[in-house]
């Protein structure tokens, strides 16, 4: 299996599990706060590190990576500063990246094993 990676994979990001995103957003909607605020995770990871986590979860020994250095890779590092949301809404993410990826992987495994499953919905970016 080969995975296309835009850039060298060393760019860092923070990811937020959907349940945490919904909880933070609902808490914001229910509050009186009306200024911009970050709802995110403090857990920062490189794309290469995330691929390694996915390899471990999936049981794949090592995916071949096709580093596409000519593709846009965005900023070198991006992470959410969540100090304000913690202070104003008393909210913080709960789901660690590894746990969220495992839940997502398990869900996709169930969905793709169903007879007549439309696999293309999992392969588009």
Question: Could you tell me what each predicted segment is?
Answer:
Residues 1-125:
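C-terminal substrate-binding subdomain of Rossmann-fold SDR/epimerase-dehydratase oxidoreductases
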